[in-house]
Amino acid sequence: VGIAQANFEWIGAIPAMVLAALVFIPLYWRAGVYSIPEYLGLRYAPSVRVVAALITSVFSIFATGVALWAIALTLETYTGLPIPFGIVVMGAVVGIYSISGGLRAIAFTDAVQVAIMFLAGLVVVWIGLRETGGLADFAAALERANPTHLQAFLPADHPDFPWPGVLLGLAVVLSPAYWCGSQSILQRTLGARTAWDASAAMMFAAFGKTLVPLLIIFPGLLALVLAAELRYPDMALPWVVKHLLPPGLSGLMFIALIAALQSTIDSAINSTALMIVRDIRGVLGRRTVPDGTRDLVLGRRISIAILLGAMAFAPFVGHFGGIYQLIQTLLSLFQGPLFALLLMGALTRSATPRAGLVALVTGVVLSAALLGFGINMLYVAFLSFCYALVVIAGVSRLTPPLPATALDRLTYRRGSAVTDQAAPGPAK
């Protein structure tokens, strides 16, 4: 895909992260929730909470499997270890520290991992440009190899990332749905000391995203220029690390690669276990007061089950093409309707509980049908989002809303500034 992949960071991350910091994170803190499905349950109905948690949990299991496969592929490229062996070993390693340590361990390890990734990535860029004769020679070689890789926006008939789909499906739907409504992302902000800390962290992360495309896309372009023969496109980065960098730096970057993928896994395991315990079992079991010790034990057992399910799925990931496209396709199944619920629930007081449930369930069914007919994932996300908006508006006119008093802390109000008060957010 080339430089066009950067749209998933610049267009597909930074604006949505700012939106999350200014609107949705303060809203979640004021609502006093621990998870995104919990907010949807308060804003709409407990049934919406269960369905949203179930859909998100299933996706997280698949996403964890994708990350495990990517780690195993990196190990095979760098060390020659078989992919099945890498899946089992890394699944056990990540499971031990994420299950035993919880969110605090995840936050600490992620902070270290990010530092390693950025430092090692900058070194890859510097050495890569030096080896190819500088930026001008690198661009010329890339132009000869594949001119489309220098295009920021691909043609409208591109099978994977057409420019209208990027602007509509990515910028309008998939990006804000992920950064404003993903439990694995927002669990860190919901676990911060104060609402101000949570929003400030998201804004700081948005600034860091400006450099991410350079660190992610450049190694793939470098592998193309150097005429690397790769079995999978996802082998580009570990190939560059192994064949271009000197031993010490190569090992550092290898650790950074593993760390980045581990971050995806530990976040998914922790957030999914939380949703299953609180948002699915808690609602279906009609529990009003959480049982801390019992929930902790259950959460660890569920985490093990999630990891085993992901390990079972991981060997099949290679049959679906690139991992990035696979993840976006899975997200397009449900993020259109889910973001419609979040947007209408946060910005309006008219969306009703019945409307939210109908829009979410039928919207996911519509997305699956559209993907089944071969429609591009980006268009699927946008069409299902628009459909869900229409359903919410229509059904809300026919069904009763929540009491006005219940909506005061569940809808966005202008002037509700982010403060350093810890009280509005969930108990820490």
Regions found by a protein language model. Give the residues of each.
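Membrane-embedded helix-loop-helix hairpins and adjacent transmembrane boundary segments
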Residues: V1-K428
